[in-house]
């Protein structure tokens, strides 16, 4: 019994010694770096603030860029998509070659200084001019009626087309749930008489097409 106790103690001591030796060598291999405070922007892979895709100059460590597309520029005629202009403006070929990724937002209403629409003219007419023109503190523009069945149906087709064009090679890493509200931010200035963002059941009809078009994006 005493012999077993001695052996057990020796094993424990040996284990402690070996652990101490290992920790000693690991501490000697440790590298300590000191960084100076800086206000410069630096890359943070696939996260954080990102520059716009149309920027001509971005630092090499930037891996993610931002692209928004208005419905008016995407589909000037029903079923006809303006890919050549969109790809050129956002330098899609360049970013693919450089291995960059994009954040995408689809927008239907961007207030500005001038009266305008960010949905196509054909959709405005096809939906029975469903929505409201506004001129307020956010700017001027047209807020579509997102409850309109025609707009919902055509939105689904537009998103499917975007997925077919951009969703095949991992270029789009993130899809921002735009589509609804000013700047695609899911809010409107309803105090100016603009119809509120629709209820959840209708909102889902604007969300689900994106999950189908970009199943691998976040």
Protein language model features and the residues they cover:
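Short, well-ordered beta-to-alpha junction loops that form the rim of enzyme active sites
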Residues: 107-108, 176-180
């Amino acid at each position: 019994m005493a012999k077993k106790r001695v052996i057990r103690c020796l094993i424990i001591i040996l284990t402690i010694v070996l652990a101490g030796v290992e920790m000693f060598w690991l501490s000697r291999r440790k590298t300590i770096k000191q960084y100076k405070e800086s206000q410069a922007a630096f890359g943070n892979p696939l996260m954080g603030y990102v520059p716009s895709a149309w920027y001509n100059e971005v630092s090499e460590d930037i891996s993610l860029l931002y692209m928004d597309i208005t419905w008016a520029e995407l589909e000037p005629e029903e079923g006809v998509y303006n890919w050549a202009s969109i790809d050129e403006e956002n330098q899609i070929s360049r970013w693919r070659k450089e291995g960059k990724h994009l954040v995408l937002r689809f927008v239907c209403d961007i207030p500005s200084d001038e009266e305008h629409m960010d949905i196509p003219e054909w959709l405005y007419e096809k939906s029975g001019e469903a929505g409201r023109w506004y001129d307020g503190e956010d700017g001027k523009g047209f807020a579509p009626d997102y409850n309109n069945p025609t707009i919902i149906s055509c939105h689904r087709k537009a998103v499917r087309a975007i997925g077919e064009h951009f969703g095949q090679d991992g270029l789009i890493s993130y899809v921002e749930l735009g589509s609804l509200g000013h700047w695609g931010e899911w809010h409107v200035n309803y105090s100016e008489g603009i119809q509120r963002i629709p209820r959840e059941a209708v909102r889902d009809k604007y969300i689900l097409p994106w999950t189908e078009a970009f199943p691998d994006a976040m």
